[in-house]
């Protein structure tokens, strides 16, 4: 059966973007259908029937799984497992840093930071395995399992997008042998499985939030839901859920988000339903889990239809991700995708390539829009490894051979001494390397060799305040000669995702250029964690409340998309100035957050016809009738026939038959356009009708003539 599905949404401020009157009831298959799972009592093992999008929304879930092992980092990969501590220095420097006081020799540097050159780092990973020494021959292991869930469209998305999220700290330390809540008798006696207890203990050692009562409860509920389900590598599926939640904890997510991260896959293939999660954990968690499921639905449709290869459609899909969901649901989906990318090896090469392509074109730019550079860098480098393995291996070797650790260590010591002499206090001075994928892109774009790129090696300095940033810049230029034209002031002129920092390139000791980045603690947290930055610091440590930060970040995502679209049309994003300075918007800013404002602007629609998806743009206030007219005469399926398309199609809006074709398309609506006649038989039926009509016409002409004569004669 031919099914056309449309998802309509506005690329406009997030004030009323989600209407609870337009809900989606969907139980759909997972993102990846290759990785097998063992059967369990709590999940169906039936295979989905291939037969159109209606089955996609209501049929059995496809079971998929993949290894959650994240303990196999690769040379040149920034997503390797890195041990995480809670110290301020590690938070500020992330995995980009190394300092003489901490890293005396190369062995520790390479052990603590998995990369081809010991410093090609991404932000802290969720991997719970101990740090391992770099090996040039190490391969990235991993599997992938993405599934989507059921129930409704995201409720209260604006309320949750701007609500308080800071409930991270807890003073209580809970022991899993004495849970402060009761569980059903059947589960109470079985929950002490060694692997589950060990997994929880490892998470608790890394992040205090896993000692929270609600997080422990979610852990054991997830264990019950996924019991018997295994990743393709043989690991329990529960490990993927915990690793996803640990990625969220790495960026400081609160207990609600971490709980939803643990449960993000439960709707699709376990006994859990939206109502079950609602009763057990409340609407906040239930709506987040459902929101992740809806985003997974879009992701699956995009991958099946190769949307990532279509630049304009991919860009619109970015906007849909941002506009459809609670911002925290987007973060959970990104964490889910990041861990699956970290464990991708279980997929066959063809699916691995397609999965990496979608991640590079959809999810990495999405992380960039959210301002989470740490996840963006990780995603890009993993995609680079799987899409271009030969280039990745070659460049990793080149970086490792060219890296001068002694020079970086000497530069750090020299800068620290100069700062102390000038009386400039600082938090961290660390060494860093440009990401492997960024180097690759720069080489292609500017047709340069690796030796001609000036910002591969670098230092990062975190100071107390903005004034000290400029003082420290003067110190840097006194120590080393400045490379002309390489100074960039992103403090006075922030990037569109809120990024602020001073960048300069100097000639370090010898002939190797050295990029130096100077920023405050607040700027660094914003750069690393974007929207989630307010989770990492207390209200008193930043200029603006978390409410304002969330509100402005949401609006900024739309601004970023707007200017990126302009850039693709020929304008330079670097030459345009932001409409408003962070964190407030001008009164006339079209992208400002207006809770009571009306939706304006185009409606972006996903149209699925013959199980093929395109992303199209409709004017505001478009109706189902407008969509039918576009899908009718302009469609190749209907062009040879004269009967109007609306007579051929039976639209369903959010699983409900449409009685009023004047119904307006709104944010997140899903419209199925099903032919009244099965598509397979449609052509045959209409050809037969045409033949019958022609035969009847031929016989009726002489008959009508005779009848006319008789009537005339009778009169």
From Swiss-Prot:
Organelle transit peptide: 1-64
GO molecular function, one term: kinase activity
Ranges annotated as biased composition (Low complexity): 65-74
Protein induction: Circadian-regulation with a peak at dusk.
Broad class of the protein's primary localization: plastid
Pfam families documented for this protein: HD_4, RelA_SpoT
Residue ranges, annotated region (Disordered): 65-84
Catalytic activity, as annotated: GTP + ATP = guanosine 3'-diphosphate 5'-triphosphate + AMP
SMART domains: HDc, RelA_SpoT
EC class (word): transferase
Residue span, HD domain: 237-341
SUPFAM superfamilies from the UniProt entry: HD-domain/PDEase-like (SSF109604), Nucleotidyltransferase (SSF81301)
Stored Gene3D superfamilies: Beta Polymerase, domain 2, Hypothetical protein af1432
This protein's record includes keyword Thylakoid: no
Compartments where found: Plastid, Chloroplast
InterPro entries: HD/PDEase_dom (IPR003607), HD_domain (IPR006674), NT_sf (IPR043519), RelA_SpoT (IPR007685)
One CC-aspect GO term: chloroplast
Enzyme Commission numbers on file: 2.7.6.5
GO biological process: guanosine tetraphosphate biosynthetic process; leaf senescence; photosynthesis
Keyword list, A-Z: ATP-binding, Chloroplast, GTP-binding, Kinase, Nucleotide-binding, Plastid, Stress response, Transferase, Transit peptide
Highest taxon of source: Eukaryota
Tissue: Expressed in roots, hypocotyls, shoots, cotyledons, rosette and cauline leaves, stems, petals, sepals, stamens, pistils and siliques.
Protein purpose: Possesses ppGpp (guanosine 3'-diphosphate 5'-diphosphate) synthetase activity in vitro and is able to functionally complement E.coli relA mutants. May be involved in a rapid plant ppGpp-mediated response to pathogens and other stresses.
Family, as annotated: Belongs to the RelA/SpoT family.
PANTHER family membership: GTP DIPHOSPHOKINASE RSH3, CHLOROPLASTIC-RELATED (PTHR21262:SF0), GUANOSINE-3',5'-BIS DIPHOSPHATE 3'-PYROPHOSPHOHYDROLASE (PTHR21262)
Protein name in the entry: Probable GTP diphosphokinase RSH3, chloroplastic
